[in-house]
């Protein structure tokens, strides 16, 4: 089957990019590809059998027209000016059979005009982390970019140490970022900001294109998508680590996996990025940061959208966030209805977990085994303060009895939203260390496991992290 690529970005937004081709690596070789995603995109298996090829930037497929995008942004709350694709190249937009499109973005593709002081490269460590994280999030049901392939090489890349140069093929319906809009707003070119908005609406919100107040309706939906995404992050214990405005997806996707981390111990102020000295992007601050980022996006739209309309959309953020978060947390607790004591029960559980440094994922998974008429709980042994747990658990069982549902039905629901497996940093690190020794077994094994996060397992993927794996420091260097 011949793949079809179109050039909407190149044709419709000529001042937002520089056209250029990838720079191949030395002795590049394909070490992993996403068979399930490739099948979804109707990619012929033969493309994965001919060396690095397009996956390593060595050649292009018919219809591809590679380019690097320019954007700007706020980093750690400070205006950083022009940024852009410093090591990534958009190879093309694949047109799918249903009329939708999928960007093919090659990360680590070499120097671009936006590389600043960088070398345009990515390392094997970071490409493995992003591939694992994006696929883990996808199978958890959270909107995200996807990983299609990883290529490693003999090219040395200099970070804290010398590492292997690598490339990741990332795919997404769009790579539109808040930072694209900021770039032209701060250059005092509001007509180009409007062109970006029109492009987004035309191709991704086409049902709004003929509406008189399309910009208000569109921005309101961007706010809602962002609020929903952040709510989902919080419910699974995901910390992004670098929520700069240039890393915010207009479509509400999880974008740019760097020093991310999933909670091990329940620590509301968890900071996964060791460069985040002030804790701006801590786990519990993510909802507030996302709203701040939306306010920056709203500012770029103010030359052609009424400020009252923008503020009205921003005001909806908190309620959308709380609605999505509340619905998912009630499911995690096994509540079929909404009762006034639900928030108090959840907050008391969180307080107990924080005091005891309880494992976030294991606590909710074990809670899924609760039988409402039994005072015994397998979760009890996870707590040192048994009296405090017993007091909470008695009230929790009483709350469960208010819903007309069998234990088996409730347990099935809870186990469908409380994963047994999340991508803990130590699991990723183990796969990375093996891959750096040319052993890809663990990389493939872990990818396969992450496809079924809600299934029970009896291996160390679902055990408590070892002591060395709990506080792994992760940086932005990639």
From Swiss-Prot:
Gene Ontology molecular functions: AMPylase activity; ATP binding; magnesium ion binding
Annotated binding of ATP, by residue: 84, 86-87, 107, 119-120, 170, 177, 256
Role: Nucleotidyltransferase involved in the post-translational modification of proteins. It can catalyze the addition of adenosine monophosphate (AMP) or uridine monophosphate (UMP) to a protein, resulting in modifications known as AMPylation and UMPylation.
Active-site positions on this chain: 246
Family: Belongs to the SELO family.
Classification via NCBIfam families: adnlytase_SelO, PRK00029.1
Sites where the protein binds Mg(2+): 247, 256
Record organism: Escherichia coli O1:K1 / APEC
Names of the cofactor(s): Mg(2+); Mn(2+)
Annotated keywords: ATP-binding, Magnesium, Manganese, Metal-binding, Nucleotide-binding, Nucleotidyltransferase, Transferase
Lineage, top ranks: Bacteria, Pseudomonadati, Pseudomonadota, Gammaproteobacteria, Enterobacterales
Protein name: Protein nucleotidyltransferase YdiU
Pfam families listed in its UniProt record: SelO
Reactions accelerated catalytically: L-seryl-[protein] + ATP = 3-O-(5'-adenylyl)-L-seryl-[protein] + diphosphate; L-threonyl-[protein] + ATP = 3-O-(5'-adenylyl)-L-threonyl-[protein] + diphosphate; L-tyrosyl-[protein] + ATP = O-(5'-adenylyl)-L-tyrosyl-[protein] + diphosphate; L-histidyl-[protein] + UTP = N(tele)-(5'-uridylyl)-L-histidyl-[protein] + diphosphate
InterPro entries the UniProt entry points to: adnlytase_SelO, SelO
């Amino acid at each position: 089957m011949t793949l079809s690529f179109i050039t909407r970005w190149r044709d419709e937004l000529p001042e937002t990019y520089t056209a250029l081709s990838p720079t191949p690596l030395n002795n590049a070789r394909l070490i992993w590809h996403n068979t399930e995603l490739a099948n979804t995109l109707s990619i012929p298996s033969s493309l994965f059998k001919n060396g690095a090829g397009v996956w390593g930037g060595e050649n292009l497929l018919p219809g591809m027209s590679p380019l690097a995008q320019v954007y700007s942004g706020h980093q750690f709350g400070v205006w950083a000016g022009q940024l852009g694709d410093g090591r990534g190249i958009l190879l093309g937009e694949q047109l799918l059979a249903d009329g939708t499109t999928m960007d093919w973005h090659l990360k680590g593709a070499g120097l671009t005009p936006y590389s600043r002081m960088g070398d345009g490269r990515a390392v094997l460590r970071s490409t493995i982390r992003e591939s694992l994280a994006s696929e883990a999030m996808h199978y958890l049901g959270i909107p995200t970019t996807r990983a299609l392939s990883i290529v490693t090489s003999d090219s040395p890349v200099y970070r804290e140490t010398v590492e292997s140069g690598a490339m990741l093929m990332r795919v997404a319906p769009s790579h539109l970022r808040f930072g694209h809009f900021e770039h032209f707003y701060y250059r005092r070119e509001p007509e180009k900001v409007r062109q970006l908005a029109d492009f987004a609406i035309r191709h991704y919100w086409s049902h709004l294109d003929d509406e008189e107040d399309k910009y208000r309706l569109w921005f309101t939906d961007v706010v809602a998508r962002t609020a929903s995404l952040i709510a989902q992050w919080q419910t699974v214990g995901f910390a992004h680590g670098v929520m700069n405005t240039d890393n915010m997806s207009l479509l509400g996707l999880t974008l740019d996996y760097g020093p991310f981390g999933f909670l091990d111990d329940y620590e509301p102020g968890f900071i996964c990025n060791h460069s985040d000295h002030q804790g701006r992007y801590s786990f519990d601050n993510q909802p507030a940061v996302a709203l701040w980022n939306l306010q920056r996006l709203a500012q770029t739209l103010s030359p052609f959208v009424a400020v009252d309309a923008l503020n009205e959309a921003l005001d909806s953020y908190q309620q959308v966030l709380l609605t999505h978060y509340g619905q998912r947390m009630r499911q995690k607790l096994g509540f079929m209805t909404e009762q006034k004591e639900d928030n108090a029960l959840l907050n008391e559980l969180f307080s107990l977990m924080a005091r005891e440094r309880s494992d976030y994922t294991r606590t909710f998974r074990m809670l899924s085994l609760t039988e409402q008429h039994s005072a015994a709980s397998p979760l009890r042994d996870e707590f040192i303060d048994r009296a405090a747990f017993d007091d909470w658990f008695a009230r929790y069982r009483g709350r469960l009895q208010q819903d007309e549902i069998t234990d088996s039905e409730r347990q099935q629901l809870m186990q469908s939203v409380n994963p047994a497996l999340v991508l803990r940093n130590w699991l990723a690190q183990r796969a990375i260390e093996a891959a750096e020794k040319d052993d890809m077994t663990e990389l493939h094994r872990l990818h396969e496991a992450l496809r079924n996060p809600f299934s029970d397992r009896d291996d160390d993927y679902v055990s408590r992290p070892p002591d060395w794996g709990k506080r792994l420091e992760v940086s932005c260097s990639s």
